[in-house]
């Protein structure tokens, strides 16, 4: 007799894996859709031109398409091009591995800067003062200081005349066309939906693919009726707003927010490699190799610091919320419990997961802030090494009250053979009972990345994505439960929506998120394709000036 559940799972997995293959981007259907796309005409950009803020950091550094077009513009003016090339050389030096190559690059930069500004000088964007410093530099420290000054001057130069000329150029016109294209309405027709990957309190998470680019994402579908019945609207909106503010390679990105008839949808980074909890307990011997522990911990620390810099406390750090991508890099996910520090005011509301909550969260009416995340980080590093949490053994049955008392009173023990001295030390420091004694919180400049546990990690290269992960997930494996194991939600009855609800849904559905959307457009080749003046198109003449999308989405 055929097992229909197993058959359904096989079909769902096969379709999902097929969609994930890079070759799928070459499908005839995808190419047909892309031929039917065109950028909006310039005449439709007049209002946007008036509204858009001319902020250099946003336009030319943060937004990928703006950055790309600004770079292309600089290449058309010799003086501007030299400044841009110099900054690229500085970045390459900063990201180079320590050794003779990096030393040689530094000396080359100093020599480049040492020429005094004069007619015909190849570095007119640098001052005489910087040239003099470079000429006088004899030690490595002096050379680094001189190049740092030169970098600042080159950046300041680009923000003046080059930027002014850029925003009156055809390159900026093209940017406006892309911004208008970015602002098109988004609905469920924009995506192809694949298998369910999991579920949460208000709905399910499924894999989706953008029809026009082939890009795969995870879509968190929040049931509107369930949200209203459980009073979850505020939490959902807070998670969305926090995700919109965060742009970090170590935190899942929000790419789209839209509504369907029944759901509010958050479309985010698809992490195909599973979560760290799965890898700790379900792949080989419990626990992870130390090389993986160090690598993941370094990326987690970077993500945590990015949140803290934005005034956000994560409050739900645990291996289950750390997801791996196709290449083996990890990102923090599920920001549903994250909270913004309003004016630096501490928080008192209890939130988190048992076994990872810091003592100050567990104590009644005690305020807390960023240090709680470092405590949970200590719990997570311990778990990655030992295959158990610090205050509860693997599969041990412990009441919430007992676990609370252990967290408040017990000193952490290191009985697992895999603990190195560095791992023990960083766990002890993260698991300090008092937040003011905790690593990352002892003083303003207390940076966990400086701990000797991370001595093998070059953090600038890590942040630039230049370090190869120690483990790469198997691309032929679906790291998710069988669809039969994912519970269905019961129907929510007796919930009606009023005008206030409908307005909330409308406000929630803001469409594409600029940075993530622009990254998708460049990554999938659509940027080059739509910018090509010679490309064949399936649009009728004149359609592009009206909508920018000739094919119904």
Curated annotation (Swiss-Prot):
Span of domain AGC-kinase C-terminal: 455-520
Any one GO biological process: visual perception
Keyword Ubl conjugation: no
Catalytic activity: L-threonyl-[rhodopsin] + ATP = O-phospho-L-threonyl-[rhodopsin] + ADP + H(+); L-seryl-[rhodopsin] + ATP = O-phospho-L-seryl-[rhodopsin] + ADP + H(+)
Residues with lipid group (S-geranylgeranyl cysteine): 550
RGS domain: residues covered: 56-176
GO MF term set: ATP binding; rhodopsin kinase activity
Record comment: activity regulation: Inhibited by phosphorylation of Ser-36.
Protein kinase domain ranges (all copies): 191-454
GO CC annotations, alphabetized: cytoplasm; photoreceptor disc membrane
Keyword ATP-binding attached: yes
UniProt name for this protein: Rhodopsin kinase GRK7
Species assigned in the record: Homo sapiens (Human)
């Amino acid at each position: 007799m055929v097992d229909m559940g197993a058959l359904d799972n096989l079909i769902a997995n096969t379709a999902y894996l097929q969609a994930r293959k890079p070759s799928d981007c070459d499908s005839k259907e995808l190419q047909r859709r892309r031929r039917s796309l065109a950028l909006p005409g310039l005449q439709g950009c007049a209002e946007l031109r008036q509204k858009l803020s001319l902020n250099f950091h946003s336009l030319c550094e943060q937004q990928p398409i703006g950055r790309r077009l600004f770079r292309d513009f600089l290449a058309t003016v010799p003086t501007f091009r030299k400044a841009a090339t110099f900054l690229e050389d500085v970045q390459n030096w900063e990201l180079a591995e320590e050794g003779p190559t990096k030393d040689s690059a530094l000396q080359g930069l100093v020599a480049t800067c040492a020429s005094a500004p004069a007619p015909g000088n190849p570095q007119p964007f640098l001052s005489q003062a910087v040239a003099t410093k470079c000429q006088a530099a004899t030690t490595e420290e002096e050379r680094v200081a001189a190049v740092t000054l030169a970098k600042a001057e080159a950046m300041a130069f680009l923000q003046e005349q080059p930027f002014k000329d850029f925003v009156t150029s055809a390159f900026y016109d093209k940017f406006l066309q892309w911004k208008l294209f970015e602002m098109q309405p988004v609905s469920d027709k924009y995506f192809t939906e694949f298998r369910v990957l999991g579920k949460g309190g208000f709905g399910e998470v499924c894999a989706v693919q953008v029809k026009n680019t082939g890009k795969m994402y995870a879509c968190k579908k929040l049931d509107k009726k369930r949200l209203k019945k459980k009073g979850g609207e505020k939490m959902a909106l807070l998670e969305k707003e926090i995700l919109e503010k965060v742009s970090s390679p170590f935190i899942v990105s929000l790419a789209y927010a839209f509504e369907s008839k029944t759901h509010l949808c958050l479309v985010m980074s698809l992490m195909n490699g599973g979560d760290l909890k799965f890898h700790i307990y379900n792949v080989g011997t419990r626990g992870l190799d130390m090389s993986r522990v160090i690598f993941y911990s370094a990326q987690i620390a970077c993500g945590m610091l990015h949140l803290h810099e934005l005034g956000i406390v994560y409050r739900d750090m645990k291996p289950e919320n750390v997801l791996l991508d196709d290449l083996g890099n990890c990102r923090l996910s599920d920001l549903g419990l994250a909270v913004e520090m309003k004016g630096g005011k501490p928080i008192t509301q209890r939130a988190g997961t048992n076994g990872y909550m810091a003592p100050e969260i567990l104590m009644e009416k005690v305020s807390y802030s960023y240090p709680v995340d470092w405590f949970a980080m200590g719990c997570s590093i311990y778990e990655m090494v030992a295959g158990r949490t610090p205050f509860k053994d693997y599969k041990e049955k412990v009441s919430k009250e007992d676990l609370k008392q252990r967290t408040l009173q017990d000193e952490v023990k290191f009985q697992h053979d895999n603990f190195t001295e560095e791992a023990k030390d960083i766990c002890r420091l993260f698991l300090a009972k008092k937040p003011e004694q905790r690593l990352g919180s002892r003083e303003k400049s207390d940076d966990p990345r400086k701990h000797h546990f991370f001595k093998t990690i070059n953090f600038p290269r890590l942040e630039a994505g230049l370090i190869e992960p120690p483990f790469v997930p198997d691309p032929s494996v679906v790291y998710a439960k069988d669809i039969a194991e994912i519970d269905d939600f019961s129907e929510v009855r007796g919930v009606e929506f009023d005008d206030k609800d409908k307005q909330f849904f409308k406000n929630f559905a803001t469409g594409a998120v600029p940075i993530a959307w622009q990254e998708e457009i460049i990554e999938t080749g659509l940027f080059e394709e739509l910018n090509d003046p010679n490309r064949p198109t399936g649009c009728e003449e004149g359609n592009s000036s009206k909508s920018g999308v000739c094919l119904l989405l």
